[in-house]
Amino acid sequence: MFSIIQKIEKEQIKKNIPIFRSGDTIEVKVWVIEGSKKRLQSFEGIVIAIKNRCLNSSFTVRKISNGEGVERVFQTHSHGIEEILVKRKGLVRKAKLYYLRTRTGKAARIKERLN
């Protein structure tokens, strides 16, 4: 039974996902269906959390839009995600950056990792 589940999960896992960590600025291109139309929508922000659970893996991206914080949780292996682009690598010491929710402006900046 367990090997059957592993086999099905292995078929559904995406192979073209870039390596990114918490603190990185990424752009996620997602398919959006509005009525009968289908288009790509881009969501760019800082990764504040990653959950690695094989096929159930997810990551949370936060951005500031019109002075309001917007967070979105994406399933890593979802068919709705077209591509993930790493724009900038951030230098952080924590895995979960939930403290960014209370910070605004210059206090919410993250240093860049150069390597």
Swiss-Prot record:
It comes from the Bacteria. Keywords: Ribonucleoprotein, Ribosomal protein. GO terms for biological process: translation. It holds the Pfam family Ribosomal_L19. InterPro entries: Ribosomal_bL19, Ribosomal_bL19_CS, Ribosomal_bL19_sf, Translation_prot_SH3-like_sf. GO terms for molecular function: structural constituent of ribosome. GO terms for cellular component: cytosolic large ribosomal subunit. Disulfide bonds: none annotated. Gene3D superfamilies: 2.30.30.790. This protein is located at the 30S-50S ribosomal subunit interface and may play a role in the structure and function of the aminoacyl-tRNA binding site. HAMAP family: Ribosomal_bL19. Belongs to the bacterial ribosomal protein bL19 family. This is Large ribosomal subunit protein bL19. It comes from Buchnera aphidicola subsp. Acyrthosiphon pisum (strain Tuc7).
